Amino acid sequence: TSQRPGTLSIRTETLKSLLMDVVEALYRQGLRNFVVLSGHAGGTHNAVLIDAGECLLSRLPEAKIAVVTEYDLAAEEGKGLIETVGDSHAGEIEASRILATRPHLVKEGAVEAYPAFPKHILVRNKQAYWPSAVWGDPSKASAEKGRKIEEVVVDALERLVVELEEFVEPAGC
């Protein structure tokens, strides 16, 4: 979606450096448990966050780190709510969540779409393959579903925080 109006992109190196700098600063101040919660479900973006987390684990001996996207939590925890298989950007999940909080931002009439990019080939003009910016079925969205999704995401995040706090890594390697 980097070619869409309103999108601000940063280089992966910048994202990694920013995350590492923030976590290291907080670690120096005494924090030890870190949940990196991303609102973006892009594969490259998440790979960078995981890579930064792995680097931080090797540099900060007492740190515990979890990396998760709120979208993954919504998809995993909302299995009984979500009707669309393969739902993603501006689809059922995202449209429902926005309908629950900022309904005026949801464009009416968005149609179901599942873009097909060339397999294994990187493309410059992503809009040629993904003209609508929709990946999923926004017609199945509702404000009520969005509120329920928000609840399950918060519950899952609370469980993750507790799990991370209680996590004891096995010794040795």
Task: Identify the residue ranges that each predicted region occupies.
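Extended, histidine- and acidic-residue-enriched regions that form the cofactor-binding/catalytic faces
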Residues: T1-V35, G39-C173
